């Protein structure tokens, strides 16, 4: 399928039709960069979905964090249920890179916990890019980090057609080359089992289906997809392509060639270290590298094989690493959401990684070629990026300098107007805020309060609580999943006021919030820049009674610019409403939708109709299963029980266990 099928009951309205037309026109005209300047609640994601549907190109959507990526994934999945919408984020629940601290002579081994489900989703994403034209990949900045070369990866794939002549032993050897393991008892992802002339293979990138190959002598008599849990055959297949378990799988001949290059570099580096009288470093480097070489010779891989990626990909020294961008076709589209945050992230990754690796090389823990296992530099990213649309309510300087066209979407189809802004004296800000909170609470509306310091947030929360206000404080120690649950409870009315510092400037929508209070708005700085103020004020833009109060004793340049831009948008929306006879309507969004990013590929619905939206999370703050490692441990325990129940033919109990696993995976997606 190469057509994008946009499924929605809405038609573009307000500024959307013109924005969509201009963006499509710009792409067709070959503009390298465009900016969609869209206010909160104007339907920017819907506009981008319409653009993708019209231009019919594979699209990479870059979000600034996993929470927003999960939300976008859920939205695009709903817009394009019949197309390949995939999720590509870092698969580490926990990651401690290897490092050396010379001052204390401390070496910290690499330690990581890999999320098996997200690893499967990453493999599924690259498969979609390689096989389909109708792919939308939602990603984070992890897309600029090194990945196996697509050329090498494609050389490893295994094609099986019905009617092929196929020796069973040769097939099993090929599966071993793909790093699949044989397991006749516990059938899991990236494993296979053999029962006479029947070979069952669980593809590494699949969470829904396994593949059954039935041989008659040395001919493939039948190929079918089946449910690995129940064994039910889903459909017959004419052919199937098996992809490697890892993006770093390398053909044997490439591996042998790479090992020769590593040996040459090792010899040169040892000579250099010995000439500098660094005998300990030389001995350490030789021992570590020779161990890695032996592992690669025997197993085809080693721990930390990515540090030899220069040789495995055949790229010269200093060349950019292969990344997800190398998997994109030439006509792809890049959409950068919240670009004022995302673009600076891309530029920040390289330097921190470089300084850590230089220390490892200097003290003999790694060869100098390990420096080429790195994220892309900003200039390299610019060179490889396809046609780009920046999406933001407050575009940054980079977008302003590079956008060939700025497309405005400041009119909301709902007719909602930007919040009215009031400036009140900072001297009496706390008492004034308290009276405003009581007014809003009486109307069952919610309030966001943003402060400058953690101490002030804590003190303000205590003060409000002492005066009978139902209040919670959102701080950096709260993990992503619980943060989403707190926002959910704010919307449900479990409490009325949420206090924070860098509070929800970009992210989840809360139509129930009618007041945003910004304390000490006249203190110039990152948290009170014009962009920060506009983003924070925008949190009240989805409520009919939306209002923002800036507590300040003077008007700063940032305040002036933020107020001016908000007023400009208000005037444009009011004029549009008058012209079209629109009466503003509040946004009523189902509270469950806040978790829409947690729609998990792999949750099987009872009717087996593709991906199902997982069940709602309960709105309580659980004392257990807070950290990703705890959730993962619980998932593994439940999976063992589920497969045991399936082996015992207790399929109803296994299905209940599967649904519970689906709920836990929802939580992991947003972490």
Swiss-Prot record:
Motif (Beta-hairpin): 91-114
Region (Disordered) location: 601-625
Chain ranges of the UVR domain: 632-667
Pfam families given in the database record: Helicase_C (PF00271), ResIII (PF04851), UVR (PF02151), UvrB (PF12344), UvrB_inter (PF17757)
Biological-process GO terms, alphabetical: nucleotide-excision repair; SOS response
Helicase C-terminal domain boundaries: 429-582
Domain Helicase ATP-binding: 25-412
Keywords: ATP-binding, Cytoplasm, DNA damage, DNA excision, DNA repair, Excision nuclease, Nucleotide-binding, SOS response
Protein's cellular compartments: Cytoplasm
GO molecular function: ATP binding; ATP hydrolysis activity; DNA binding; excinuclease ABC activity
Matching PROSITE patterns: HELICASE_ATP_BIND_1, HELICASE_CTER, UVR
Entries under InterPro entries matching the protein: Helicase/UvrB_N (IPR006935), Helicase_ATP-bd (IPR014001), Helicase_C-like (IPR001650), P-loop_NTPase (IPR027417), UVR_dom (IPR001943), UVR_dom_sf (IPR036876), UvrB (IPR004807), UvrB_inter (IPR041471)
Subunit structure: Forms a heterotetramer with UvrA during the search for lesions. Interacts with UvrC in an incision complex.
Functional note: The UvrABC repair system catalyzes the recognition and processing of DNA lesions. A damage recognition complex composed of 2 UvrA and 2 UvrB subunits scans DNA for abnormalities. Upon binding of the UvrA(2)B(2) complex to a putative damaged site, the DNA wraps around one UvrB monomer. DNA wrap is dependent on ATP binding by UvrB and probably causes local melting of the DNA helix, facilitating insertion of UvrB beta-hairpin between the DNA strands. Then UvrB probes one DNA strand for the presence of a lesion.
Name of this chain's protein: UvrABC system protein B
């Amino acid at each position: 399928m190469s057509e994008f099928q946009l499924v929605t009951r809405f038609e573009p309205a307000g500024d959307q039709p013109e924005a969509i037309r201009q963006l499509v026109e710009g792409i067709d005209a070959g503009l390298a960069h465009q900016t969609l300047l869209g206010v909160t609640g104007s339907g920017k994601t819907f506009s981008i979905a319409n653009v993708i549907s019209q231009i019919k190109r594979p699209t990479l959507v870059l979000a600034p964090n996993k929470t927003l990526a999960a939300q976008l994934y859920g939205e695009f999945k709903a817009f394009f249920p019949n197309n390949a919408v995939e999720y590509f984020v870092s698969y580490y629940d926990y990651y401690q890179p290897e490092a050396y601290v010379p001052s204390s002579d401390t070496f910290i081994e690499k330690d990581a916990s890999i999320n098996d489900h997200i690893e499967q989703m990453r493999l599924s994403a690259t498969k979609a890019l390689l096989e389909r034209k109708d792919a939308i990949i939602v990603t984070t900045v992890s897309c600029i980090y090194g990945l196996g070369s697509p050329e090498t990866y494609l050389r490893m794939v295994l094609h099986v057609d019905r009617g092929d002549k196929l020796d069973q032993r040769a097939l099993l050897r090929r599966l071993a080359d793909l790093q699949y393991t044989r397991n006749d008892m516990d059938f899991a992802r990236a494993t296979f089992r053999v029962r006479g002339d029947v070979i069952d293979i669980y593809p590494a990138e699949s969470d829904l289906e396994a593949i059954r190959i039935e041989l008659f002598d040395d001919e493939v008599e039948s190929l079918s997809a089946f449910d690995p849990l129940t064994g039910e055959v889903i459909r017959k297949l004419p052919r199937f392509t098996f992809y490697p378990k890892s993006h770093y799988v390398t053909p044997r001949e490439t591996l042998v060639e790479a090992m020769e290059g590593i040996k040459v570099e090792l010899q040169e580096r040892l000579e250099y270290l010995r000439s500098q009288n660094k005998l300990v470093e030389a001995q350490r480097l030789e021992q570590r590298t020779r161990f890695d070489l032996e592992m690669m010779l025997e197993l085809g891989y080693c721990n930390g094989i990515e540090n030899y990626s220069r040789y495995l990909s055949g790229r010269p020294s200093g060349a950019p690493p292969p990344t997800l961008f190398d998997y994109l076709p030439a006509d792809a589209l890049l959409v950068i959401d919240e670009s004022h945050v995302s673009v600076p992230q891309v530029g920040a990754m390289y330097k921190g990684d470089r300084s850590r690796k230089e220390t490892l090389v200097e003290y003999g823990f790694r060869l100098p070629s390990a420096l080429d296992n790195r994220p892309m530099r900003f200039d390299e990213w610019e060179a490889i990026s396809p046609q780009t649309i920046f999406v933001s309510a407050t575009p940054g300087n980079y977008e302003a300098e590079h956008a060939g066209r700025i497309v405005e979407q400041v009119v909301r189809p709902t007719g909602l107007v930007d919040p009215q802004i009031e400036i009140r004296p900072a001297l009496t800000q706390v008492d004034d805020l308290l009276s405003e909170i009581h007014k809003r609470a009486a109307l069952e509306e919610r309030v966001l309060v943003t402060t400058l310091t953690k101490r002030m947030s804590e003190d303000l929360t205590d003060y409000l609580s002492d005066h009978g206000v139902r209040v919670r404080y959102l701080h950096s120690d709260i993990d992503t999943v619980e943060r989403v649950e707190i926002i959910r409870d704010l919307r449900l009315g479990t409490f009325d006021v949420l206090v924070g510092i860098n509070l929800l400037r970009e992210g989840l929508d809360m139509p129930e919030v009618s007041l945003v209070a910004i304390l000490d708005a006249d203190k110039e700085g990152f948290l009170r820049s014009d962009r920060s103020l506009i983003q924070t004020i925008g949190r009240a833009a989805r409520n009919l009674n939306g209002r923002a109060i800036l507590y300040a004793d003077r008007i700063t340049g940032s305040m002036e610019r933020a107020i001016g831009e908000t007023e400009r948008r208000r005037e444009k929306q009011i004029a549009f409403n008058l012209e079209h006879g629109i009466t503003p309507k509040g946004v009523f969004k189902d509270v469950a939708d806040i978790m829409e990013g947690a729609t998990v590929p792999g949750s099987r619905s009872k009717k087996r109709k593709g991906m199902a939206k997982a069940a709602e999370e309960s709105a309580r703050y659980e004392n257990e299963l807070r950290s990703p490692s705890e959730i993962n441990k619980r998932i593994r325990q439940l999976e063992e029980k589920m497969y045991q129940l399936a082996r015992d033919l207790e399929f109803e109990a296994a299905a209940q266990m599967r649904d519970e696993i689906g709920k836990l995976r929802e939580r992991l997606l947003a972490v």
